[in-house]
Amino acid sequence: MHSRLLRHDSWSDQAHCRRIASVLRGEGHDSVASDVTSTEALRLNWRSVHGAVLAASLHAGTHPRAAREFVQGNVDGFNAVPSWFVSVSLSAASANPQERLAAGRIARAFLASACWAPRQLSCVAGRLVYTQYSLLTRWLMRGIARRERATTDASCDQDFTDWAALDRDTHQFGRDVRESVRLRTQAEHYKSDDATTC
């Protein structure tokens, strides 16, 4: 089974995609991760894809335009197979329930704007990657961390991801892909049987 993992290239998306790919490979899936702006992703042959995951980070209330444009250009492929949208944000880990609800609303609006109806949607907490931020971004993120009572020590990164929950969602996605492949194979078998009896 071939699962395609797509991401908009950010530190959080990469970490989450690596984890999802690792779990799926452990279940026997052939999982390939690509950036949505890569030549490989832009030339994707959807006929060879049994499942698709898109991970994109939410920053300043929006997902990256490149991720949205990729989905809009490939929405038929996404909707033809079991698919999963992983929206990565610090808001998903917020102590404020309104922040968490807003992250979910923004993720659903992203899907609606692209006419994408994935089987799964996960709003996943991201990371504060202080060591990789520019000076301005580090300053802004420290302000957000202070508001959330998280570490403001910019010498180390902080991960808020609930990896066990992400693994559970990944296992569910793997089961959905396997079942979809089983049903498709069964339908093709019946179709070939009907063709030989006519």
What are these regions (language model features)?
Residues 50-53, 82:
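Structural motif
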Residues 3, 26, 59-198:
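FMN-binding flavodoxin-like domain, especially the glycine-rich phosphate-binding loop
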Residues 11-12, 40-42, 92-94, 130:
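Flexible, glycine-rich phosphate/dinucleotide-binding loops
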Residues 16, 45, 63-67:
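Residues at alpha-helix caps and immediate loop-helix transition turns in enzyme cores, especially N-
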Residues 46-47, 78:
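A short, aliphatic-rich alpha-helical micro-motif
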Residues 56:
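Glycine- and other small-residue-rich loops at beta-strand/loop junctions that grip anionic moieties
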Residues 27-42:
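A short beta-strand-loop structural module common to alpha/beta enzyme folds
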Residues 1-29:
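N-terminal beta1-alpha1 ligand-phosphate binding loop
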